[in-house]
């Protein structure tokens, strides 16, 4: 069966993740409940005529994908597969508000068009004039992993050699106010918002666009091989460990083979037990990393997690800022990622050095 | 050689019927489901017609026996109804007995609830439960929970081709051995959001949509849900299951032309059909019926027609029809609805009529089948195209 | 008429987010679509709404826009002839 390699990365996030090596400029913000992305200079990547109607998510997606392609040194791809939990929600908001406020009159199409979930993938295709396979997944916190799994299958089916895969989500004011109301986002004035050992419900929200160029061949820019991806809709806390071992076993591995486990801790006291059970039991002696203190929580934050995993393998270090337990290994070869959101949409992703 | 992935169950609820059987009766009796809108209050109700499921949300809640504190969107409710029917026809009693997945599709998700309560959430705490039902994935989770399914659950949203892509992914997951069984399809309820969105694009008809007619004036929106059960040949053999038809071909390509419009020559559509034929290992002349996307917008039918001419030749195009005059355009669900109709065409050896057609288009000599036609149907090709140039083609084949 | 043309230029820049284009760069007879300003069919739909909202002119067929929105000159002439507000 053909293998899948990560050959290029592009990341627009709350941190400075472009023009940097690996989180050396990262800063933890424990005072805010909403973290905005550090924006690149869009006009370096997108023409003024094209940019004027683009949503934030579209712009970030285009820039992140261009960075990934540049790093992988590819100019065309055989498939574009994206994941997004909410799509370009800012435009959805704009259109919906206009409908209500203007009583369905004098509406214009631009924000409606942008609100379609596949708009990022479509605009990347338009920019690249890429007529290939183009899909978008929208399923909460496994939106990105669905795209990743599809891409891996495409390479295994020998239907594609070079694939652009990415996760994109954006914050929008009214939606975040609703998420605060519903308790998904932490309350104000309860900071500092620490992700580990948190005592309050909800999470600090972020946004971002993280893209990967996947190829069937190893080359000088290769970060890691993607060994496997598994998606499960629902698990009880006490099922996580057995599911995790079954996943490793299916790949001929055991816990001791894992050099770092990257966990999706988001500081929600209600659901972090899903990570704790792995952190405090099977993987007690394994180096552990966490990242949502840097990226914030969002539906496709796990794409940022995979970016972290790939960088660990490439740089052979787990920066202190993401280390859970300060354990080290002489070499970082095999990395397991686990993520879930509110007890649903669980994913296990396995990558290794090659 | 196998003719593709087995379909062992289907379920549907649309403007022309609440079951597969009811839909079939409407299809063969030209019973259009396009009417004035009743369940949504909109200022456009006098000037547009829609394909609406004539059941209120309260009726749907009662039918599904949901608890009073449920937070189901209409999209999730009609999706659950269709998925349950599909499971029943496939005679699945223990859903997690095999590696089973659900690949859903939606474009609006829970928008119907979001738009109904948008500014009221801060006023009424009883509404807050609906905030989480906005996103697309919520619909799939609700359906999976109602079916008791634990496994791979995901959702595709590529506008109006969404469900075709969910059927395609489901077939690939079985083909690759990742899953033994997968429930695939899509659901979209009518919403003010989409009604107004399509209105801004000026592609809504003020009358009844007339696909491939020279005087076509645009589409009627509709709402519907349909799901199909795909199973591996191992299960089919072991449990001696009845195979309704097979998913034999699939293809997706991007038009890469415009954010909403299709290209003049239908490049994306051409590539999608070409790919699906290749996967099915069929020649164009082996296709007996095309269920076209046929939305009746000036742009779609011209682009799709040109792509059909390129694949089949102007004089050799097989019988084709759009069933959207009956159901309306049901967006992310459309390809699942039309997958059910394609299977019905195969099972009953019929070509469904393309209603409301009068005048051939000037650009080419393609005339849809306008009356019910009985003939042997081995292979049906079904097209679905969406915004963002997303073009998908599925091919369904008789099992034996 | 000159004032109307100036007004249209301002509105086009605003409605279509043409922030990089200056008022004086748009000539009255420049093509707005295609090679000129580079506007496309979505812009045309935006302009149709502007006609309705600001001048009370309702177009039912988007194809009509092709002729009306040829240039600032043609737009101004059409609005002058047909405006309801």
Residue ranges, per PLM feature:
Chain A
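Conserved "HGTGT" condensation-loop signature of ketosynthase/thiolase-family condensing enzymes
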Residues: 1-135, 145-149, 153-157, 168-354
């Amino acid at each position: 069966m053909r293998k899948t390699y990560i050959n290029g990365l592009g990341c627009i996030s709350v941190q400075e993740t472009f023009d940097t090596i690996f989180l050396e400029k990262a800063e933890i913000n424990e005072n805010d409940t909403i973290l905005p992305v550090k924006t690149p200079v869009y006009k370096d990547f997108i023409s003024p005529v094209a940019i004027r109607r683009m949503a934030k998510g579209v712009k970030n997606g285009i820039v992140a994908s261009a960075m990934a392609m540049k790093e992988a040194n590819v100019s065309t791809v055989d498939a574009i597969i994206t994941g997004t939990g909410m799509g370009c929600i800012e435009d959805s908001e704009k259109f919906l508000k206009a409908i209500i406020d203007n009583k369905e009159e004098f509406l214009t199409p631009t924000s409606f068009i942008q609100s379609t979930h596949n708009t990022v993938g479509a605009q990347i295709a338009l920019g690249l004039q890429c007529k290939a396979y183009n899909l978008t997944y929208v399923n909460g916190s496994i939106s990105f992993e669905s795209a990743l799994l599809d891409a891996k299958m495409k390479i295994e089916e020998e239907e594609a050699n070079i694939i652009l895969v990415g996760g994109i989500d954006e914050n929008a004011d009214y939606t975040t106010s609703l998420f605060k109301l519903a308790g998904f986002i932490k309350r104000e004035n309860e900071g500092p918002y620490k992700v580990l050992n948190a005592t309050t419900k909800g999470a600090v929200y972020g946004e971002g666009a993280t893209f990967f160029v996947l190829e069937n061949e190893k080359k000088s820019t290769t970060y890691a091989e993607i060994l496997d991806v598994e998606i499960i809709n629902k698990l009880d806390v006490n099922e996580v460990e057995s599911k995790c071992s079954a996943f490793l076993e299916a790949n001929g591995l055991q816990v001791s083979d894992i050099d770092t486990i990257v966990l999706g801790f988001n500081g929600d006291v209600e659901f972090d037990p899903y990570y704790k059970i792995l952190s405090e039991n099977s993987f007690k002696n394994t180096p552990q990393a966490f990242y949502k203190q840097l990226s914030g929580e969002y539906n496709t934050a796990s794409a940022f997690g995979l970016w972290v995993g790939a960088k660990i393998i490439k740089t052979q270090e787990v920066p202190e800022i993401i280390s859970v337990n300060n354990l080290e290994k002489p070499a970082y070869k095999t990395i397991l990622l686990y993520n879930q959101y509110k007890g649903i949409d669980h994913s296990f992703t396995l990558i290794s050095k090659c | 050689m196998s003719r593709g992935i087995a379909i062992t169950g289907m379920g549907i609820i649309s403007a022309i019927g609440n079951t597969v059987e009811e839909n079939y009766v409407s299809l063969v009796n030209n019973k259009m489901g396009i009417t004035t809108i009743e369940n949504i209050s909109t200022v456009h109700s006098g000037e547009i017609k829609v394909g609406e499921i004539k059941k209120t949300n309260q009726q749907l809640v009662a039918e599904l026996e949901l608890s009073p504190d449920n937070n189901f969107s209409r999209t999730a409710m009609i999706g659950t109804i269709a998925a349950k029917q599909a499971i029943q026809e496939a005679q699945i009693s223990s859903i997690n007995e095999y590696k089973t997945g659900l690949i859903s599709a939606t474009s609006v998700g829970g928008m119907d609830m979001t738009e109904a309560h948008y500014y009221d959430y801060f006023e009424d705490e009883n509404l807050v439960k609906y905030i989480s039902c906005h996103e697309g994935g919520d619909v799939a989770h609700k359906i999976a929970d109602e079916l008791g399914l634990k496994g791979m659950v995901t959702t595709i949203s590529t506008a109006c081709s969404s469900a075709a892509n969910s059927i395609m992914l489901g077939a690939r997951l079985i083909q690759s051995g990742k899953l033994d069984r997968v429930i695939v399809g899509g659901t979209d309820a009518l919403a003010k959001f989409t009604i107004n969105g399509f209105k801004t694009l000026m592609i809504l008809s003020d009358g009844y949509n007339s696909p491939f007619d020279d005087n076509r004036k645009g589409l009627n929106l509709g709402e519907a849900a349909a799901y199909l059960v795909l199973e591996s040949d191992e299960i089919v053999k072991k449990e001696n299951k009845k195979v309704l038809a097979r998913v034999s071909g699939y293809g997706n390509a991007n038009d890469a032309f415009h954010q909403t419009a299709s290209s003049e020559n239908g490049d994306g559509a051409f590539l999608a059909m070409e790919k699906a034929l290749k996967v099915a290992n069929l020649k164009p002349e082996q296709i007996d019926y095309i269920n076209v996307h046929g939305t009746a917008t000036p742009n779609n039918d011209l682009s799709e027609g040109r792509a059909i001419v390129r694949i089949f030749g102007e004089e050799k195009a097989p019988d084709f029809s759009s069933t959207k005059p009956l159901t309306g355009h049901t967006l992310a669900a459309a390809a699942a609805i039309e997958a059910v109709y394609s299977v019905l065409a195969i099972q009953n050896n019929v070509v469904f009529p393309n209603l409301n057609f009068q005048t051939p288009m000037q650009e080419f000599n393609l005339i849809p089948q306008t009356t019910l036609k009985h003939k042997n149907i081995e292979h049906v090709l079904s097209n679905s195209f969406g915004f963002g140039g997303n073009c998908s083609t599925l091919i369904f084949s008789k099992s034996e | 008429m000159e004032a109307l043309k100036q007004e249209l230029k301002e509105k086009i820049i605003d409605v279509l987010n043409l922030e990089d284009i200056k008022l004086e760069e748009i000539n009255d007879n420049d093509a707005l679509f295609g090679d000129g300003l580079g506007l496309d069919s979505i812009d045309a739909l935006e302009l149709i709404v502007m006609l309705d909202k600001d001048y009370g002119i309702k177009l039912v067929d988007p194809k009509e826009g092709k002729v009306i929105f040829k240039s600032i000159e043609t737009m101004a002439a059409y609005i002058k002839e047909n405006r309801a507000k």
